[in-house]
């Protein structure tokens, strides 16, 4: 039974958005860039920020008022949106590299001519793809390592936009435009603005995994489709293996529907074959399996130095600050939980398990270069949390007041996240 929206629930939404605004303002005005927030004066200038804020609030307000529900997930719409997004990602690409990003140029320049690619088991296919991309583009057009990474990042962003729009009918039919606006408002979008690291392609593949899983839950594809998508993602970066609990949930649904484990066993076999074939190929092409034990994943198996146990308080405060940047709408989880707006359908449970799995990574996996420098390591958790939250928000906006409040939430998130993205773009200028 759907609970009727009440005035007290609306007030709770307004309070959550107000708290979100206050936290953003504290990061901006009280601490500036020192708190990994944004410095509006350096990023935009006050007048530019004010104009941007006014335009954003007006556009999202009109979307909230009219709440257009015509379908936007058509193939043509998704392809056009993806194509139009690429130049936006490129024009605003980052000029800030973290410690790992700065190390990629000497590593690839040393290893690619020698063995064909710079490789580790942690991010195997990401590094292989970027190594070969740089090798060919450097030969043909003289591209640098950074330039090749940034082209791949923006292309992954266009792919993500395509998948996001294709998701809307399945995930947020009551308010598709609000869902898209909300998901695009997270700090994890920096991944697709030319980020020079090994998470961008993985993020796009994980988005495909979510789409494939939703299609499986709606009976459109077999279980092997999302299973192989997740296996490919894990081959690109082992971080994606933290999503196996969500794959187990899909296997449970398959067993409940069919009454046997045959489909789940076949899907698991396909996924394991992909991963085994990947590792076996590189055993004979530059990355022996024995080196797995010196990787971060290998250290994790030995419980050696990768878990955030007994860290100083500042570490956990940085994690909280980062999480609020990656998923600004997280405070909306409070009223959504109190009024039970998440639902118990299979897609909601799947998204919840996926988000929880990646948030567990953020809680227990220790950053090796500092939390704020390692923001992209934890970005998938913010992305999946936003998909989960904005699905619930889109399903709960049943009156004009809720629509406007949700639009305000998206506007605050956009201003904070994209001020940071612009600040990174202007870095060094």
Predicted regions and their residues:
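Hydrophobic, aromatic-rich transmembrane alpha-helices
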Residues: 58-67, 162-165, 318-345
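Transmembrane-helix motifs of polytopic, lipid-linked glycan transferases
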Residues: 151-171, 208
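Membrane-lumen/periplasm interface segments of specific transmembrane helices
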Residues: 26, 263-336, 358-362
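Short acidic/glycine- and proline-prone juxtamembrane loop motifs at membrane-interface regions
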Residues: 191-201
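Membrane-interface alpha helices of multi-pass inner-membrane proteins
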Residues: 223-238, 244-249
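Membrane-interface transmembrane helices that cradle and orient dolichyl/undecaprenyl
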Residues: 170, 209-224
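Extracytoplasmic catalytic/substrate-binding loops of multi-pass membrane glycan-assembly enzymes
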Residues: 90-108, 116-133, 143-147
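Perimembrane helix-loop-helix junctions
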Residues: 212-218, 243-273, 337-344
């Amino acid at each position: 039974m759907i609970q009727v929206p009440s005035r007290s629930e609306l007030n709770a939404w307004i309070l959550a958005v107000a708290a979100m605004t206050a936290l953003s303002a504290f990061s901006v005005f009280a601490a500036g860039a020192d708190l990994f927030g944004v410095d509006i004066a350096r990023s935009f200038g006050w007048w530019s920020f004010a104009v941007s804020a006014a335009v954003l609030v007006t556009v999202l307000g009109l979307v909230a008022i009219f709440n257009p529900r015509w379908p936007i997930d058509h193939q043509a719409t998704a392809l056009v949106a993806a194509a139009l997004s690429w130049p936006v990602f490129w024009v605003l690409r980052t000029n800030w590299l973290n410690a790992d990003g700065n190390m990629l140029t000497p590593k690839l320049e040393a290893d690619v001519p020698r063995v064909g690619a710079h490789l580790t088991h942690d991010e195997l296919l990401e590094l292989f793809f970027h190594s070969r991309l740089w090798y060919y583009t450097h030969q043909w057009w003289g591209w640098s390592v950074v330039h090749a990474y940034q082209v791949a990042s923006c292309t992954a962003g266009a792919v993500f936009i395509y998948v996001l729009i294709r998701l809307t009918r399945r995930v947020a039919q009551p308010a598709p435009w609000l869902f898209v606006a909300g998901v695009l408002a997270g700090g994890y979008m920096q991944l697709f603005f030319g980020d020079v690291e090994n998470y961008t392609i993985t993020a796009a593949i994980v988005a495909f995994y979510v789409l494939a899983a939703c299609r499986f839950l709606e009976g459109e594809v077999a279980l092997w489709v999302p299973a192989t998508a997740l296996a490919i993602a894990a081959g690109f970066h082992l971080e994606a293996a933290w999503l196996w609990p969500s794959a187990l949930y899909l296997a449970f649904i398959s067993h409940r529907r069919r009454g046997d484990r045959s489909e789940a066993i076949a899907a698991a076999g396909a996924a394991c074959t992909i991963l085994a074939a990947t590792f076996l190929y590189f055993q004979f092409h530059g990355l022996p399996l024995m080196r797995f034990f010196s990787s971060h994943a290998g250290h994790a198996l030995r419980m050696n130095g990768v878990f955030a146990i007994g860290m100083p308080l500042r570490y956990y405060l940085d994690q909280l600050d980062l999480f609020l940047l990656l998923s600004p709408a997280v405070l909306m989880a409070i009223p959504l939980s109190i009024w039970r707006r998440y639902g118990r359908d299979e897609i909601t449970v799947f998204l919840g398990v996926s988000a929880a799995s990646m948030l567990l990574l953020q809680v227990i996996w220790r950053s090796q270069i500092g939390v704020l420098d390692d923001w992209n390591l934890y970005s998938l958790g913010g992305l999946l949390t936003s998909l989960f939250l904005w699905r619930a928000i889109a399903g709960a906006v049943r009156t004009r007041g809720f629509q406007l409040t949700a639009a305000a939430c998206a506007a605050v998130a956009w201003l904070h996240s994209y001020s940071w993205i612009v600040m990174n773009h202007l870095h060094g200028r």
